[in-house]
Amino acid sequence: MSETVKDKVIIDEKVSTKGTVDYAEGAEYSERLSNHSSDFSQWYTDEQILHFMKKLGYENRTLYDIPEDVAYILKKMPELTLEDSFKILKDSIIYFKDDENIPHDQYEEWKRLVDLEDLDSKEGIDEYDSFDIRAFASAIKFHSPYQEVRAVVDPEDDPTIPVETFRAYFLAIIWSVIGSGFNEFFSHRVVSISLNTPIIQMFLYICGKAWAKTIPCWTITIRGRKYGINIDKPWTQKEQMFSTLLYAICQGAFYTHYNILTQKLFYHSAFSFGYQFLLSLSVQFIGFGFAGILRKFVVYPARALWPTVMPTIAINKALLGKEKHESGMSRYKFFFLTFFIMFIYNWFPTYIINILNTFNWMTWIKPSNINLANITGGVTGLGINPISSFDWNVISFNSPLVYPFWSYLTQYLGCILAALIVIAVYYSNYMSCQYLPIFTNSLYTNTGHSFKVTEVLDSDNKLDVKKYQSYSPPYYSAGNLVSYGAFICAYPLMITWSFIVHSKLLFNAFKDWALNLWAMRKLKSWVTMFKSDYRALDDYDDPHSNAMKNYKEVPDWWYFAILIGSLVVGIAVVEHYPTNTPVWGLFVCLGFNFVFLIPTTILQATTGYSFGLNLLIEMVMGYALPGNPIAIMILKAFGYNIDGQADNYVSNLKIAHYCKIPPMALFRGQCVIVFIQIFVNLGVLNWQISNIKDFCTPHQNAKFTCPDAVTYYNASVVWGAIGPKRIFNYIYPIFKWCWLIGACIGIFFGVWKRWGKFYPRYFDPMLFVGGMLNMSPPYNLMYYTSGMIVSYISQYYMKRHHLNLWEKYNYVLSAGFSTGLVLSAIIIFFAVQYKDTAFNWWGNTVPYAGADGVGYPLKNITDTANGYFGYAPGHYP
């Protein structure tokens, strides 16, 4: 064995496999080591390497199969002194405190190693401890402390790799036009299908490789500048990711199509294309402005993990990454293997054997038993079933291969509590809900029929009190009641929890914004804002931020200009067109997003979970603008899409940060794509309205019944025409108490976490209530139970006991299955479902037979004395 480790020696000693001792100075040693990175036995003892791999979780790796990330960490380790390493670990203990995504045993090991600095003499530090101190510090300094990041992200960058090329733009624009049009067209169908980002990544890879090989390297001169339609280089990883991110920005919700559909088809308001374009332009771009503010909180910091972006990076690495020879199948082969497996398998649950989709086997025992169907049914019941589905479309509903296990488990526990509350609400017959099915998302009348909102509106699409009094108030199923209650709880919970737990971060953020706005009084501040040498990353020292310092950052004023420009366009729309929408309503939406954006985006960046502000905007504006459904819809579009588009854009910024895509190139490209997307989506939408017979009607032959638009319309009537005052004060008074319940939960857990002696490390009340919110009709426990099993296997068992396999294949598996599923669904739709060629046999009909398939209420409305429940006609609130 080697001698005692000496202080201030970069790598104090090297024990070869023969036992001879060698010493080296840092730079020379690092160069020699980089030339032999595949044979670390020349520079470290076998025991040291195996010991460190075990510390990182690689239980089954050998010296002949060292993971790429470990090899890189060991390669960079000579650049750190022992003092440097101690400082890095001490800073990391503070920075990553309470970070659930850092393995607990790893964090405790950091603390143990840092405590060794207090020894009287550094010579008393054990050889292995000294090695671990440098190795862990090297992982943090030169790579990442997160296993998820090390699995798919390359720590180094080559700035000479082409990114913003003509071919990358051309392919991105073509596929964005195809994808946006396709997704818009089929988004209004009952069973919608879409071209998601993974499938487009595969198409981009095929097209990019073909372009590089077949298109001549000609140049085009524009205003004296030459542009090559092809370059004499292979299709690169950065071009692939750049094109992917341009497509990804148009995968966010094109929210204004709900406004246009409801106003044209349900409110019969003939607004011009100019109105549609300007409204869409304002709504789609206003979120970009907020994204610039969010960068320093959820893009640049290393703690902003963004687990949901890992599959996108994994596909890129699998398709174009250079893999070193390792045991087992390559990522490239594994991706296409999983793609073909899922492409074939998806035919069975989707078309051939539907019981694989909805495996409600317990209801088959007695199909007519309503109670059994209510509790265990997967169609209209709560889905309490340990083996509920074998369909990857259902299993992957909540991304079990992507969300951290602690995040998925917390959400699942929230789902279980929500199911128990639904049972309590239903079987206690709260507000006579037993006269309705237990778990549906429809609105009902007091006679148990579907609530038709047109029955209570006048010719101006406002509430007609006489019609309302002769018809019925709207009633919710028990499942919808609990879902709405959880949604209401989430808002005050988010505020109280965040301002207690993240008080310093939020205080500094709001202080920074206030000071910047106040500084705008001076000319010097405006000059500084327009400087070209914007250095936003100077305060960050992780490897990815350091690599990104090679590229110019997008100045704040670019985002500020888009925010102001979009707001001006929005004001012009609501003022010029007959929308009945006050300008101050836009500023209220901006204010709510200003308060909620940082907490909600931090939640998404660290846990993968997100929720929107749509219900909050509906309720607040319903109080402020009673009887004005058009205004509610417009303000809801702004209030929701600011958050939605900002989150979408900053997640793309984080991918660019990980993959070293120049920020200014991404900004330019995504602005161009969003502008094009507006024309494509509006063109497709207006064509559908004009050319598809019975479009958005319940009996449309091709099932283009617009379920989302109908829900949007119903919500505009309930919260806009009827109003939250009637709902909260009379029909469902429990809702108003949910605000207080949410605030109390946030205060209780916030105080406990910040000042309590012990707090469960992996418990986040926002995720728990978010899980309750997930349990929203028609998505019952069936959509989460099978995923819970997969999450345990992947994110817990495999990650803990087979980390080498998990790192190499987990996100590739997620991407391969997702890609195969989407392409298979498209083929199935056009081959058999579009022609309505049903495959009728027992395996396809039994899930929908009996009480679970129909959704019977527990009580029959005809058994009541008056033939209705609740308030008497003429006395409705």
From Swiss-Prot:
* Sequence ranges on the Cytoplasmic membrane side: 1-167, 211-240, 294-334, 396-404, 502-553, 604-614, 693-730, 790-811
A single Gene Ontology CC term: Golgi trans cisterna
Superkingdom of this protein's organism: Eukaryota
Record's bilayer topology term: Multi-pass membrane protein
Kindly give the Pfam families that the UniProt entry links to this protein.
OPT (PF03169)
- Transmembrane segments in this chain: where? 168-188, 190-210, 241-261, 273-293, 335-355, 375-395, 405-425, 481-501, 554-574, 583-603, 615-635, 672-692, 731-751, 767-789, 812-832
Q: Where in the cell is it found?
A: Membrane
**Species of provenance:** Saccharomyces cerevisiae (strain ATCC 204508 / S288c)
**One Gene Ontology MF term:** oligopeptide transmembrane transporter activity
Q: Does the keyword Glycoprotein apply?
A: yes
**Which residue spans belong to the Extracellular compartment?**
189, 262-272, 356-374, 426-480, 575-582, 636-671, 752-766, 833-877
Among InterPro entries, the record links this protein to: Oligpept_transpt, OPT
Q: What is the lineage of its organism?
A: Eukaryota, Fungi, Dikarya, Ascomycota, Saccharomycotina
Q: Per the UniProt annotation, where are the glycans attached?
A: N374, N860
Which family does the similarity line name? Answer: Belongs to the oligopeptide OPT transporter family.
Going by the UniProt record, its keywords in alphabetical order are: Glycoprotein, Membrane, Peptide transport, Protein transport, Transmembrane, Transmembrane helix, Transport
Its BP terms in the Gene Ontology are:
cell redox homeostasis; oligopeptide transport; positive regulation of monopolar cell growth; protein transport; regulation of phospholipid translocation; regulation of vacuole organization; vacuole fusion, non-autophagic
The leader peptide range reads: none
- Per its database record, what is this protein's job? Transports tetra- and pentapeptides. Does not transport glutathione.
Provide the protein name. Answer: Oligopeptide transporter 2
